[in-house]
C-alpha cells in the first residue's frame, strides 16, 4: 500500500508532507490539532465528534505480538497525522506573518500613547 502525501503550494513557497508509518503520530486517530478546543471541554461539553478507535485485524501477529490494523484504519491514522502536520505548518506560517504586523501595530499604538505621533 502506498503512503498518503500532500503538497502545499503557496505564492512564495512549496512544502511536501509525507507520512512516516513508524512515527507514533501516524498511529492514532486522535489528532493533536483536531477536536473540540480546551476551552469548550473545560466548559463541560463533550466531544461528540471524536473519531472511533482504529479497527484491529481479528488475529494478532503471533511472531511479534503486535496488533495489526485494518488497511482502512491504517489510512485513517496516517491521514490524521498528515492533517496535524498540515495544520501545524499553516498555523506556523500564519503566526510568522502576523508577528511583524502585530509589532508594527503595537509600535503605532505606543507612538500614539506616547504622543510622539504627529497630528
Curated annotation (Swiss-Prot):
Top-level taxon of origin: Eukaryota
Alphabetic keyword roster: Activator, Chromosome, Nucleus, Telomere, Transcription, Transcription regulation, tRNA processing
Compositionally biased region (Basic and acidic residues): 44-58
Signal peptide interval: none
One GO CC annotation: nucleus
GO biological process: tRNA processing
Compartments (UniProt record): Nucleus; Chromosome, Telomere
Biased composition (Polar residues): 25-36
Region of interest called Disordered, as start-end residue ranges on this chain: 1-62, 97-119
Bias (Acidic residues): 108-119
Pfam families linked: Gon7
Record-linked InterPro entries: EKC/KEOPS_Gon7
Family, per entry: Belongs to the GON7 family.
Function description: Component of the EKC/KEOPS complex that is required for the formation of a threonylcarbamoyl group on adenosine at position 37 (t(6)A37) in tRNAs that read codons beginning with adenine. The complex is probably involved in the transfer of the threonylcarbamoyl moiety of threonylcarbamoyl-AMP (TC-AMP) to the N6 group of A37. GON7 likely plays a supporting role to the catalytic subunit KAE1 in the complex. The EKC/KEOPS complex also promotes both telomere uncapping and telomere elongation. The complex is required for efficient recruitment of transcriptional coactivators.
Quaternary context: Component of the EKC/KEOPS complex composed of at least BUD32, CGI121, GON7, KAE1 and PCC1; the whole complex dimerizes.
Protein name per its UniProtKB record: EKC/KEOPS complex subunit GON7
Organism field: Kluyveromyces lactis (strain ATCC 8585 / CBS 2359 / DSM 70799 / NBRC 1267 / NRRL Y-1140 / WM37)
